[in-house]
From Swiss-Prot:
Main location class: virion
Organism expressing this protein natively: Influenza A virus (strain A/Swine/Italy/839/1989 H1N1)
InterPro entries reported in the protein's UniProt record: Flu_NP (IPR002141)
Location in or out of the cell: Virion; Host nucleus
A single GO cellular-component term on record: host cell nucleus
Stated name of the protein: Nucleoprotein
Amino acid sequence: MASQGTKRSYEQMETGGERQNATEIRASVGRMVGGIGRFYIQMCTELQLSDYEGRLIQNSITIERMVLSAFDERRNKYLEEHPSAGKDPKKTGGPIYKKRDGKWMRELILYDKEEIRRIWRQANNGEDATAGLTHLMIWHSNLNDATYQRTRALVRTGMDPRMCSLMQGSTLPRRSGAAGAAVKGVGTMVMELIRMIKRGINDRNFWRGENGRRTRIAYERMCNILKGKFQTAAQRAMMDQVRESRNPGNAEIEDLIFLARSALILRGSVAHKSCLPACVYGLVVASGYDFEREGYSLVGIDPFRLLQNSQVFSLIRPNENPVHKSQLVWMACHSAAFEDLRVSSFIRGTKVVPRGQLSTRGVQIASNENMETMDSITLELRSKYWAIRTRSGGNTNQQRASAGQISVQPTFSVQRNLPFERATIMAAFTGNTEGRTSDMRTEIIRMMESARPEDVSFQGRGVFELSDEKATNPIVPSFDMSNEGSYFFGDNAEEYGN
């Protein structure tokens, strides 16, 4: 990459820091998760949660959502200017679950946002600690990615629902900064840009005036983020075309959809980080561990180690399978929703099954669900091996994939060949190579056609024993490539937003 010199590692983006060496990065990431842990402990005290209740993932999510809501400036401002009946713009809350006489009860709590902000800042040495907030957003985003399909959102923007492997981070708020941008998939960026262009088509003032100038800057910035994810010159050149367009319209939408399709084979670089629920960091801080002193990394062994030693509980509905509930959360913790199931299974040490075969709904419980029948279980979040998370799409080559999801986006740097369904993908590229991007389109199609099965991605990278913290002895697994590798294969997962 030409721009390598100016790139910050995404640990640095995560902590908002300038260039730092490895030790400083580990320390600042440690400070970030330590702050989350301290905040969580304080909230458990405020809410008088028992140790068990504090380890309940549903309680963790409510507490995380409260602090995110308390710091959501734009929404807070909007709520104050547009008061809606029954919603106090100065308060935030949610369901907290407590165990009374052997039964789980739901308690709706309400707190002043100001109070939550005070507790958060106090846990973070008086700072706003936006990095920690983004970290929580990415954990929620990873959980959504593992739980829901984005079929409807894809179809609405004119994309193919089988392109779901490109949709990482599609539920991340816009305000998630550089760290958020790094984990967004190519499809997510394309979808955001298409929505913007469509608004411009329908509203002639969208690009005009002082607001329009700001809109234009945002548009070009998003184009540059997407351009930076592509690994080939032709894809990047096409992004320049889209960015420089005087009046973005249907031609740009066409180009973007073409680029999204091309990313199924010529994969973009999408960062992966293991972001854990706040209660996990809370448990570790409570045990006396000093994250900042010891240092921490989101992409190495550390999150695996935390999960090896933490007990997290979850509420479970009567007909749900605890093993499946655990798989869902494990995938979310490691940002592995679009990873090849064979790789995930090897690392986890137990079979990871496609979404359609899971007997479990999402982790969160709706307010109208009956608590009488709820039970709780221990989530099994341990793994057999660990592997370094990747920020590249790997080299591409051909391999059998499935009907429901026709490509993968690797999470772990593990040597393998990457499955994609060439016939299905190439069928979408018939005909249309005319117009101002014709030479780039032709070049991209040529590269896609010549992607070979022999090319192994992540040459020589493997998985590591949990005792091998310095990653000295890679174990390169061999995968049975005749099996199915896609998670959203022929799937019936719920839509996000139900």
